[in-house]
Amino acid sequence: MPNVPLIQAALGQAVTDGVFPGAVLAVRHGGAAIDVFTAGRLSADEAARAVLPATVYDLASLTKPLSTVTAVALLIQAGRCQLHDRVESILPELAGSPIGTASIWHFLTHSSGLPGWRGYYERVSPNAAIPATEEDRRRAREAVLRMIRDEALIYERGARSLYSDLGFLLLGMIVERCSGVPLQEFFRDQIASLAGTSQLGFVPTEWADNFLQCARRRGSDVAPTEHDTWRGRLLCGEVHDENAASLGGVAGHAGLFGTAEAVLTVTGAWLEAYHRRPSVLDALLVKEFTCRQTVVPGSSWALGWDTPSPPSSAGRFLSEASFGHLGYTGTSVWIDPLHELEIVLLSNRVHPTRKNERIKAFRPLIHELVYREYVGDS
């Protein structure tokens, strides 16, 4: 049996040490009941409410595997696209551009040649005028698509990997073109609904106020992120990532909000398929998506999922078959299929400022502790 007080104490000590104002840690081992640990408060304000298991966090780049990668896998299963389809065959606006001949596989492995990040939001929404309707979001997506079309590649495609939000911006658009519906609707109907959760989803700009009110009526709260200088306010219930915000809160690289237990509904679908048990995902495809793509020199990436490579946020003990992802706001998920161990850490380490990077040292320590307590010494 895991030493629950020891794990709880470690999470509480992280709050004391200023790693984050509060956090939720959810662990599932061997398909057993989920253990949820909480510590701290919603914000740095001493009067703030305590974090609860139902606290909702901005998941940041966990959007990539939970939404975009899962959506791509489902679309491949349905025959709507293939891993090696060229992006220009799906987004003809990119025909003739430097990135046009890259494939879905290149974006999933972060080996497309695109830069890692660009501040497109400064051009799309120069006055922080966030799109508030589907038509506004469509125009913003078209503007971002043109900007990516005009990007010069900064390394030879496939020669190495460079973690890129730009590639996942395109993957989000690919999901919409191949499915024929907005990304938030595809996620709601084809992923969250089938996984059996209503506590995980995108928050388009016009839904933000209602989202906060609904969360509170359910007895949960939304953890704030940063005092954002671009938008001139404390962010709570609206996406922290500026490029995602400039697209109206819905994008392939960021935008999901949810609870730790809700995250486990999606990771559980991946784990079940990995072991050829009933799942919405195809077992062979899941094995391919979670296997490190060694054809890219020096890369730790599988298809949209990362794999452990020292020094890793996963710590030293998770098996080589493990896969996971990090989120900039202070979130992470790691899945060890050989030990059937799923670990979700949600926090708002960027509150009140993104300059706090203490979580980098904490992540491997908490993953090692959880492994020892649930699996045993390694």
Please annotate each region the language model reported.
Residues 2-59, 80, 146, 241, ...:
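Short, conserved catalytic-motif segment at the N-terminal edge
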Residues 3, 7, 59, 63, ...:
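Hydrophobic (often cysteine-bearing) scaffold residues that line and stabilize catalytic clefts
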Residues 13-26, 46-106, 155-166, 251-254:
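Short active-site loop at a secondary-structure junction
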Residues 35-37, 333-334, 340-349:
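Short, well-ordered beta-strand elements
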Residues 97-320:
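Short, surface-exposed loop or secondary-structure junction motifs
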Residues 249-255, 322-334, 348-353:
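Glycine-rich phosphate/pyrophosphate-binding beta-alpha loops
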Residues 272-275, 281-293, 310, 352-378:
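Short, gly/Ser/Thr-rich active-site loops of penicillin-recognizing serine hydrolases
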